[in-house]
Amino acid sequence: MKNKFDSLFINYFAKEFFYDTITMVDRREFNKNMRIGVDIDGVLNDIGQWHYSCGFKFCIENHINRGFNPYKYMMEEQFGLTDEENYKFWKEYIFDLMVSIPTRPYAAKVLQLLSEKGHEIVILTARDNRYLTNQYANTMNFYVEEWLNKNSIPYDEIIAGAGSKKEKCIKNKLDIMIEDKASNVEAISELIPVLCFDAPYNLHVKKDNVIRVYSWYQIYQYFLDNSE
């Protein structure tokens, strides 16, 4: 039976091996430049956690209590909101999403590393202007760019708006997509590999061309492992 000292000793050297491995693989060189599609909500940020935090706050303040389902993707499905309640939520919280939501850990760093290796970063988001009115009408692209720049996220192109992401992947000749929404993951994976950022609402997605990921450095490891 291992004593306490043995466990500490094993854990220490396991950690040392892990960090040595990351340092070693960082020195490898990519040989093929790729056009990498990157979603914003759920990939660059943790939209699920943001939904849970802001959604419960909104529901309590508005005396709404219809349960909660984390396995649904849309806010109105998660909290059972009516169309009117959902619209009210987004009118109140859209700027918090556009301006204040933090990035996932190391998202900017990993994209910087990939960009330095010659890969093209294409931001592909379904965000649109539906909740922006008056002086803020049609400003979503401006706020997307501002948020990316504020968080030091490199990019070569930004493609925003509603419409089929699968068709946009074809039109913009993407080689791989990093995505979280289940329907997008399934559709795009018919064309190109998809790195699916793990979330409760996409757990049912299991396809040959889908690689489930849990962190941005795991994404970096994928590109290292699959470089030519």
Each language-model region and where it sits:
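Substrate-recognition element of Asp-dependent hydrolases with the DxDx(T/V) motif
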Residues: 98, 107-144
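Short hydrophobic segments within beta-strands
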Residues: 39, 124-126, 178, 197
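Active-site neighborhood of HAD-like aspartate-dependent phosphohydrolases
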Residues: 6, 13-85
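Short, basic/glycine-rich phosphate-binding loops at helix/coil junctions
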Residues: 78-94, 121
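Polybasic, lysine-rich low-complexity intrinsically disordered segments
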Residues: 2-3
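C-terminal cap/substrate-recognition subdomain and adjoining C-terminal extension
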Residues: 119, 134-176, 181-228
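Membrane-proximal envelope and lipid/glycan-remodeling enzymes
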Residues: 13, 17-24, 126-129, 133, ...
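Short, glycine-rich nucleotide/cofactor-binding loops
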Residues: 94-103
